[in-house]
Curated annotation (Swiss-Prot):
GO terms for biological process: cardiac muscle tissue development; chaperone-mediated protein folding; lens development in camera-type eye; muscle cell development; myofibril assembly; skeletal muscle organ development; skeletal muscle tissue development; striated muscle cell development. Interacts with apobec2a, apobec2b, hsp90a.1, hsp90a.2, hsp90ab1 and myosin. SUPFAM superfamilies: ARM repeat, TPR-like. One of its GO terms (cellular component) is A band. Expressed in striated muscle tissue including somites, heart and craniofacial muscle. Detected in mesoderm adjacent to the dorsal midline during the late gastrula stages and in somitic mesoderm during development of trunk skeletal muscle. Also expressed in cranial skeletal muscle and in cardiac and smooth muscle. Detected in somitic muscle and heart primordium of 24 hour embryos. At later stages, expressed in muscles of pectoral fins, jaw, branchial arches and eye. This is Protein unc-45 homolog B. Its main location: cytoplasm. It holds the Pfam family UNC45-central. TPR repeats lie at residues 9-42, 48-81, 83-115. The keyword Glycosyltransferase does not apply. Acts as a co-chaperone for HSP90 and is required for proper folding of the myosin motor domain. Plays a role in sarcomere formation during muscle cell development. Required for myoseptal integrity, myofiber attachment, motility and craniofacial development. Is necessary for normal early lens development. It comes from Danio rerio.
Length: 934
């Protein structure tokens, strides 16, 4: 190795040190890594120092495994390297290896027995180890005791339930889960499952879920010990709670095996086998379940839900969609089979009311996960071949299975469904089945017809070919189920023009008659939920017409009946309810109509959409008020809690739109909060489409801006509100969103330090500072008010202390603005900053020459609040620096202080008068003035 290379390693080490001191940890690691490569292997001492330094970097990055490894390499060279020993101790502690951390700090304390840091760490680790040993021994006995109670013939049911619940709670803690696992827990839990008692099965499954959470090695051992087929057979039982608990266990296993386990095991990692085979086996087992006759409806739903959640890519930027392609190859036909099931026919798979829709959602997710046209072509060909294979002129049951499968596809990837519906003979088959004598044929055909007429082109086909047939079915059939579906078909065809007043498909008044019948069925409690659901489907289409939505908003019993149905077990209703509410509140996106463009379109004989008179602002406001009175907020809160497989991102976006429309009027926000609207908005703001999250965040901001956040978002939920509000501060968002987000954050920042720290962690500070420079008066005022509440934080104060920026100058100049609310906020921030940091009291005199003039204006302001803030700032300056105090007393400020201090006591101005008197007392204490004597 040349002298140049040796010099390089020293230079790189020095460069790394500079980066570390500047807080540039990644660059420091790069420099140290290069230094290690260029350093001479024989120069062990130099290498040890570099490893020790890199260990400090890894500690900062919370990469504790690498930190321990580098510290060990330094200790191998010099066993008495006290810095390396202490760094390894810190890393071991974070990795949970308390005994090894204790040994390292013990050696540190031996080398430097008077070092308080080492002695404190030694004492703390000793106490933690003792506590851990105590917990371990007590946990072992508790685990054994619980199993004894569960396996005994204990007649006290309450005692057994308590033991089962304790076991579940214990399994959720890592130490408890490990003790259960080590004490032969898995075979004992399997014995509990084999008792066949539902409460015992639930307890065992939930305990296993806790043991598998976040621990890959344990999850692998459990899945091999219990067996995937055994777990599938448990999930297949006809018990909703057991099916749900087993699905949760599968999810915990999947998360742990696919990287949800965030721990770093170092060398122990080598003992864990590759988990890809286990994940593949689970996927195949779930695909087998969905088309098996031995699986209950609840079990099938959960298998479909697991596939929906885990097969498509979580991050669309990833190019690996192999799981999706594997699922299509091995399971697409099975999913299509589920979609095609007709419950009214014999020999069908057991299903719940939600099964077909969950299968449709899965189809949609799989189709969306495909990356190129050849993949989509393969998907389409499999669906096409499956439907064609079911068409049989001699077997009507097979035909309706094919049409029902198409219905399922139309409810999922509808673009694909529209292509398949356009195949030769498919539409004709639907129309022919509508005229069949069998009621089940009519039922399936009408449903397919409704789903197929999504596009105006398809609707036109049905308007010319199917309207008379639907009218005939509606008039002649005595079966309410068919009657209502025929009506919905007519509703959908009648709404094919959307909200365009000039594109009505039917004659004036026809849609109102259809809607009236839908409302009548909706309010009929003797009809089953599924039939009444179709009445809402009809309204979802018809409420595109402003006359219909206005009539519906005036029919309070119909609205209440719809809201009540959202609480039923059939959650397939949610999309239709959301559509109806979006239509009633007009919360869909509307393009801005430019009069010149309208004239141009008319001149060129292009169609121009017309607004219905009842779609104007005052009508919308009236409808919103009626919806709130009928209890729409409670219904929305229930809908938000639905399972994600049913509550799709599109449905969430619609709910967010409705919430935003409801919160428009400040007077209505209290009712929304009282009915749980604040809590319901949080998940909508955190998950869903980008547009939906923004709408929900805006609604949250409107509530947070005017309500007490502790009441609107009780408990820990309040901390979840911060991120959605910060997302509205981007410069790409419109001014109203910026303004209301700032007002909401101001309210939150005024509550406690924890919330202020959370706002800073979400990187809101640069955005808030940016808006303090905004030209728009209200946005600038809101940003300044928010900053006024944030300056209590040390981190914010430090930013004002930094040189090379105009933050403090801006604050001083804002105090001189004419707008009172802006002045009050800026003066408040200045008063708090100068109270917290004396250096800032001196610095403010250097940032602008106008500081004294502005301060004097504050101290003689007509508004007592602003005057008080100005006088507090003067007091802080008198207290901060003798020279500054002298300068203030020699100016006109003394005259102002004397005038205010001599005012008679006045409740409205008392704070300002007291502050002025305190300033004079301070000046007297400093020997700058003397008391007046006769």
């Amino acid at each position: 190795m040349t002298m140049g290379e040796i010099g390089d390693s020293v230079q790189l080490k020095e460069e790394g040190n500079k980066h570390f001191q500047a807080g540039e940890i990644d660059q420091a690691i790069d420099c140290y890594t290069k230094a290690i490569k260029t350093c001479k292997k024989e120069d062990k001492k130099a290498l040890a120092v570099i490893y020790r330094n890199r260990s400090a970097c890894f500690l900062k990055k919370e990469n504790y495994s690498n930190a321990a490894s580098d510290a060990t390499k330094a200790i191998d060279v010099d066993a008495a390297d006290i810095k390396a020993l202490y760094r390894r101790c810190q890393a071991f502690e974070k990795l949970g290896k308390l005994d090894m951390a204790f040994k390292d700090v013990q050696r540190c304390a031996t080398i430097e027995p008077k070092n308080k840091t080492f002695l404190e760490t030694l004492r703390r680790l000793g106490a933690e180890i003792q506590q851990k040993l105590k917990t371990t021994f007590s946990t072992d006995s508790r685990v054994q005791n619980m199993f004894d109670i569960l396996f005994s013939d204990e007649p006290d049911k309450e005692k057994r339930e308590k033991a089962a619940n304790n076991l579940i709670v214990l399994a959720r803690e890592d130490a408890g889960a490990e003790r259960i696992f080590q004490n032969n827990g898995v075979p004992l839990l399997m014995q509990l499952i084999d008792t066949g008692k539902p409460e015992m099965i639930l307890a065992a499954i939930r305990t296993l879920s806790g043991m598998c959470t976040g621990h890959r090695a344990r999850a692998t051992a459990i899945i091999h010990s219990v067996g995937i087929s055994k777990l599938c057979s448990i999930m297949a039982v006809d018990n909703e709670e057991i099916a749900l608990a087993t699905a949760n266990l599968f999810q915990c296993v999947n998360d742990s095996l696919s990287g949800g386990d965030k721990r770093n095991y170092g060398k122990e990692e080598a003992l864990v086998l590759d988990s890809s085979k286990d994940l593949k086996d689970i996927l195949l087992a779930l695909l087998e379940m969905i088309a098996s006759k031995n699986v209950s409806g609840h079990g099938r739903d959960q298998a479909l839900n697991l596939l929906t959640k885990n097969v498509p890519r979580q991050n669309k930027k990833s190019t690996d969609n192999s799981k999706c392609l594997f699922t299509i190859d091995h399971g697409l036909k099975k999913i299509l089979k589920v979609c095609g099931q007709v419950p009214d026919l014999p020999d069908q798979l057991p299903m719940t009311e939600n099964t077909q829709l969950i299968a449709s959602v899965l189809l949609s997710k799989l189709y969306d996960d495909l990356r190129c046209d050849p993949e989509r072509d393969q998907f389409r060909d499999i669906c096409d071949d499956y439907i064609k294979s079911k068409f049989d002129p001699n077997d009507m049951d097979k035909n309706i299975h094919a049409i029902n499968t198409l219905s399922g596809i139309l409810q999922g990837p509808f673009d694909l469904g529209n292509v398949l519906a356009g195949r030769q003979g498919v539409m004709e088959m639907m129309v022919a089945l509508c005229g069949s004598e069998r009621e089940v044929d009519q039922l399936v055909a009408v449903e397919a017809l409704i789903h197929a007429s999504t596009k105006t082109s398809k609707a036109s086909f049905f308007i010319s070919n199917g309207v008379s047939l639907l009218k005939e079915m509606y008039k002649k059939t005595k079966n309410e189920k068919i009657k209502i579906r025929a009506l919905v078909g007519l509703c959908k065809l009648g709404s094919a023009g959307g909200d365009d007043y000039s594109m009505r498909q039917f004659a004036e008044g026809s849609t109102e008659k259809l809607a009236k019948q839908c409302r009548k069925w909706l309010c009929n409690p003797t009809l089953d939920v599924r039939t009444r659901k179709w009445a809402i489907e009809g309204l979802a289409y018809l409420t595109n017409d402003a006359d219909v939505k206005d009539d519906f908003a005036e029919d309070e019993p119909a609205m209440r009946a719809m809201f009540e149905l959202t609480k039923s077990n059939d959650k397939t209703i949610l999309y239709a309810v959301a559509c109806t509410l979006v239509n009633c509140t007009n919360s869909y996106d509307k393009k801005e109509i430019i009069p010149e463009m309208v004239q141009l379109a008319k001149f060129s004989k292009q169609h121009v959409p017309e607004q219905h008179p009842k779609d104007k602002k005052d009508f919308i406001v009236r409808r919103v008020k009626r919806l709130l009175k009928a209890g729409v907020t409670s219904a929305l809160a229930v809908m938000v809690k639905a399972d994600n497989s049913i509550l799709t991102d599109q449905t969430k976006e619609m709910l967010a739109r409705v919430f935003l429309a409801l919160t428009e009027d400040v007077k209505d926000r209290g009712i929304i909060v009282a009915q749980g609207g604040g809590k319901a908005l949080i998940p909508l703001a955190l998950e869903g489409t980008d547009k939906g999250k923004i709408k929900a965040s805006h609604a949250l901001a409107k509530i947070a801006a005017v309500s007490n956040p502790e009441i609107a978002f009780p408990g820990e939920r309040i901390y979840e509100v911060v991120r959605p509000l910060v997302s509205l501060l981007g410069t790409d968002r419109d001014g109203m969103e910026n303004f209301e987000a700032l007002r909401g954050l101001t309210n939150l920042a005024g509550l406690n330090d924890k919330l202020r720290v959370k706002i800073l962690k979400e990187k809101a500070l640069p955005e808030i500072e940016n808006y303090m420079f905004e030209d728009h008066e209200q946005i600038r005022q809101a940003a300044t008010e928010c900053m006024c509440n944030l300056v209590c934080c040390k981190e914010v104060q430090d930013r004002y202390l930094e040189d090379g920026n105009d933050k403090l100058k801006l604050l001083v100049l804002l105090c001189g603005e004419d707008e009172e609310k802006l002045q009050r906020a800026a003066a408040g921030a200045l008063a708090m900053l100068t109270a917290a940091q004396k250096k800032l009291a001196v610095k403010m005199t250097k940032v602008t020459e106008q500081w004294l003039e502005i301060l004097q204006r504050l101290c003689i302001h007509d508004n007592p609040e602003i005057q008080h803030r100005g006088l507090v700032t003067v007091f802080n300056m008198l207290d901060a620096d003798d020279q500054l105090a002298k300068k203030l007393v020699e100016s006109d400020m003394l005259e102002i202080l004397t005038y205010v201090a001599k005012l008679e006591d006045n409740p409205k101005k008392q704070n300002a008068i007291d502050a002025a008197r305190a300033c004079l007392s301070k000046a007297m204490d400093n020997g700058l003035i003397k008391p007046f004597s006769n």
